[in-house]
Amino acid sequence: MAIKKSELYSSLWASCDELRGSMDASQYKDYVLVMLFIKYISDRYAGQPFAPIKIPAGSTFQDMVALKNTPNIGEDINKKIIGPIAEANKLSDMPDFAHPDKLGSGADMVKKLTNLIAIFENPSLNFGGNRAEGDDILGDAYEFLMRHFATESGKSKGQFYTPAEVSRVMAKIIGINSQNSTSETSVYDPTCGSGSLLLKVADEAEKLISVFGQENDTTTAGLARMNMILHNNPTAVVKHGNTLSNPLFRDDSGRIKTFDFVVANPPFSFKSWSNGVNIPEEQQESGRFYGYGVPPAKNGDYAFLLHIVKSLRRNGKAAVILPHGVLFRGNAEAEIRQNLIRKGIVKGIIGLPANLFYGTGIPACLILLDKENAESRKGVFMMDAGKGFAKDGNKNRLREQDIHKIVDVFNKQIEVPKFSRMVSLTEIAEKEFNLNIPRYIDSTESEDIQNIEAHLQGDIPNADLEALQHYWTVYPTLKNHLFEKSKRPDFSRLKIAQEDIKQNIFSHPEFVTYSNKVNAVFTAWKNKNTAICKAIGADTKPKAFIHTLSKDLLDAFSNLQLIDKYDVYQHLMTYWMETMQDDCYLLVSDGWKVGNAVEWAKKEFEGRLIPKGLLIHRYFETEQKALEQLEANRDALAAQLEELEEEHSGEEGFFGSLDKVNKATVNAELKTVTADLKADKTNAELLEKKKVLEQYLKLSEEQAEANRKVKETKAGLDKKLQDKYPSLTEAEIKTLVVEDKWIATIENTVKNEMQRISQRLTQRIKELAERYETTLTELLQEVNHWEEKVKKHLEKMGY
């Protein structure tokens, strides 16, 4: 039976992290990813005579498994596994598996490498059918590990990885797709790191295209080569060297080679960029700086950008991550920026949230370059996407809704207030070619201004009510239902009591109509997609499946006011990532029969796909209510016992002399009291104590009986559940999973979103009503009243 993907990756990381010991994560990643590489090519290509990757005899992952627990395991991995594969495929810079400083020596090394190999023996890590089934185990596992390695590597060593969310945005807005690409289409990254950006662009093409990358770090370049093979791009060309001083991709005439698409996340503000660069030569007609200007000596941002411009074909397009400073810094950079804009090469600028990238917290932007129709370009499309993100540990991450919104708005060139607009070249020229986004897009939230007149004389300013116009558009008569004109112009008065605001809003006919409309939209989406969900089978591609569902949900909520379609979309995608994704992959792997399976942990069990609660709700609600009643009775008895014990504890209490209060000690005490009463039958205190002790014992007996009934009833319900799971039909499983689990959860999040929207209106009206409810005159009168009372009290006290 397949393991859930989330469980697989989490356990994979936990095992790796445990084995790392004192080694830096940026180093340990090299060993883990080489192991992943060997496992992948062995599963994928071993025994295939015409495979794109050559695996010499005796160098497969199974040959590595045979080396476990052998004294020379490190040397043998180098000589028998890594060395032959590297030589056969012209790979270099592979990590040393016999390095004593990193892996220990003697028995310590043997244990560490044996355990590392064992991690990848997990049968669920089988890459034989990877991608062909639409289940990219390798790609997802790789992303998971790389993100964790980058997080653990710290500020100076995490730059080998561009966050997947940013890579996805770049790939989707650069302009490549399955229709406009062929095997000859080329994509290039001059600072490719581990190659994640290149791979995301290649994925958008949905076919094998020509991939090229250059990386200055030796080890990272080797990692990028492996990454290309791991992601089914074995023909990709990755070269090692300094892109600025020694660009290795050149045409037959020796000039900089050009490409259809370029993506890059170069090192920010690289100070020593000019080392080895022949600046006078680069200023010549064939040089990279010709017609633009020379970047400043201690800042390489524009050096990389101009290299990218030079690397673009006549109709080439690029997406580059650079720090915000490139948009507004002066002197040499201002000259270059002006020339780029005048030539029409800059197509768009997107401001990103701060702290997205590993290795730096500097705010960054995406610069979109496009040589196609550059001479006729009239403006630059600008976007401030800096506020859309979620916290993820000590970093920020783009959410699914942020990615989708950025891509939608940019590709369709939609102008959204406080978010995006097309800025004419004329306006940019008027602002001296300064591209600082706040100069063109004011994304600041409107200030909540306090109205002095309202504080002095009461009532609510009409300006505050007009700020809620998006609500009044949907509920046109609600405003007059809640407010009436004040005696003063420009002010209104609340017609109802503050405590009745929520009830009046939620029961208003227009609110009810809108709620019904939202429900109808969701119901239409549900009716359309329930059958699609129930049709999941072995040939289903989970990523295409969720794309269909999520796109349809976005489309469904596109024409509704108040509710943000991207918020609704995010709810679906969050549920997909937390639960639905695992369910879908299980169904693709094992079929709907996985709904019959249960998992045991100690003495408790749970459905592998269908939680017990869903089965109970649909089939055993009567039994569950009976159990809940018994549990309530048991809890009530426990509360009575606790209350009785608390009442009679303490030194003077009837239980005060007991070390512990339980059935045995109370029984013994009752015998003593009964004996004492034989000698003093009318002792009121003894009689009362006997009564309390007997009450305690009676409640204890009742509690024991209640516990027995709860245990017995729960066991009976568990037995029915255990019998029900294997007897569920496929149709019943589909109903439970799709309707009761997935659709019901998504529907609930949509309803909660509707509640939040309405609650914001309620809270705002309450806030305004409370703010101006008491005038300054009334406040001063109240202050004077209490001041006089205090004075009188002080006078009585002689002060």
Label the model's feature ranges.
Residues I229, N233, P267, K310-R313, ...:
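Hydrophobic alpha-helix feature that most strongly marks membrane-spanning transmembrane helices
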Residues M1-S178, K239, T243-L248, G351-A354, ...:
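Non-catalytic, mostly N-terminal accessory regions of nucleic-acid modification and defense proteins
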Residues S156-A264, F268-P280, S286-G291, Y302-A303, ...:
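Conserved S-adenosyl-L-methionine
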Residues S11-A14, E18, D24-F37, V238, ...:
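Conserved Class I SAM-dependent methyltransferase catalytic core
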Residues Q283, P295-K298, Y725:
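Catalytic core segments in nucleotide and nucleic-acid processing enzymes
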Residues E18, P123, F144, H148, ...:
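Conserved, well-folded catalytic cores of nucleic-acid-processing
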Residues L366-V407:
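Conserved P-loop NTPase
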Residues G106, R131, G213-D217, F261, ...:
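Hydrophobic alpha-helical scaffolding
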